[in-house]
């Protein structure tokens, strides 16, 4: 079993039922994605539209591609014909540009509205008051080719579990306020998808695999002698 397959197997074993795992494949070559695909994984996230398009063209067509990075309006055209879900929609301008590209492609594009819940000002996302104002407007109501699947947010970059939970509780509160306006799901996102303790367990698991492989190779060398 490859290292990638081992990691996927471990992470899946830690997830509750009904959770969809998006493997972040940005900056990784097509060969690494193919290894994950051969291990049974089908959902991948990319952050650069042109790179995403190239990988879509080179890899199997049953892959479900997610656009997870910041998306510029002039780059939507590269991914609109095939992308499954656009994360990080953080402005009215971007949402309405996605609507225009979706109409050109003749397909419905699914999106997540990104809400700023972290302590860092560098994090992107809607201010909740501004988003609540926008979802009550006619332009938001007139996006027939855009389906708002839910909200997402990136928690504060910290090992403090209390702070992370606070951020996601705030995101859940925002989601509940938006439900009457057609927002369907609550989606947690960010680097806390695997919490610190699970990362440590994964590292220990992979180190044990490497140790067993080394022992096996050593025994094989002795047998040959």
Protein language model features and the residues they cover:
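Long, contiguous binding/interaction regions
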Residues: 176, 182-225
């Amino acid at each position: 079993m490859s290292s990638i397959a081992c990691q996927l197997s471990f992470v899946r074993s830690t997830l509750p039922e009904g959770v969809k795992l998006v493997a972040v494949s940005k900056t990784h070559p097509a060969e690494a994605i193919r290894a994950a695909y051969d291990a049974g994984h089908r959902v991948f996230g990319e952050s650069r539209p042109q790179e995403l398009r190239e990988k879509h063209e080179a890899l199997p067509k049953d892959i479900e591609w997610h656009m997870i990075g910041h998306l510029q309006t002039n780059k939507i055209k590269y991914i609109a014909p095939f992308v499954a879900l656009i994360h990080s929609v953080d402005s009215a301008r971007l949402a309405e540009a996605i609507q225009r590209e979706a109409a050109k492609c003749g397909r419905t594009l699914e999106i997540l509205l990104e809400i700023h819940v972290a302590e860092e000002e560098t994090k992107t996302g809607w201010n909740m008051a501004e988003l609540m104002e926008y979802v009550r407007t006619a332009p938001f109501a007139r996006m027939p080719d855009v389906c708002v699947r839910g909200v997402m947010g990136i928690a504060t970059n910290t090992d403090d579990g209390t702070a992370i939970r606070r951020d996601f509780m705030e995101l859940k509160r925002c989601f509940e306020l938006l439900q009457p306006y057609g927002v369907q799901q609550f989606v947690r996102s960010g680097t806390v998808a695997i919490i610190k303790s699970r990362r440590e367990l994964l590292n220990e698991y992979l180190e044990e695999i490497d140790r067993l492989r080394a022992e096996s190779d050593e025994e094989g060398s002795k047998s040959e002698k």
